[in-house]
Amino acid sequence: MSIFSIFRKQKSAPLARERLQVLLAHERASSGTDLVAVLREEILSVIAKHVQIDNDRVHVKMDRDEHVSILEIDVEIPLGAHLRAA
C-alpha cells in the first residue's frame, strides 16, 4: 500500500455493496417485530384449541444473529388445565 492509495477514491462497487448490506440489515431488523406479532397470534390460536390459557402468559421473542434467527416461545400452562378435544 503506497501513500497515494490513501487519497484514491474508493471504487463504487464495494461502496454499493456496503450500502446494500446496511439496507438489508435494516429491513430484516424492522420486519422482525411484525413477524413476531403474527407468530404470537397464530401460536395462541393453536394452543387455545387444546388448552385454556391466559394470553398474557405467552411470551414470544425473536433474536437475530449474523447467521441465524432464534424464535423463543414461553407458554405458562396451569397445572390443572383441562385439555380440549381438537
From Swiss-Prot:
One of its GO terms (biological process) is regulation of division septum assembly. Keywords: Cell cycle, Cell division. SUPFAM superfamilies: Cell division protein MinE topological specificity domain. Pfam families: MinE (PF03776). Prevents the cell division inhibition by proteins MinC and MinD at internal division sites while permitting inhibition at polar sites. This ensures cell division at the proper site by restricting the formation of a division septum at the midpoint of the long axis of the cell. Belongs to the MinE family. HAMAP family: MinE. This is Cell division topological specificity factor. The gene is minE.
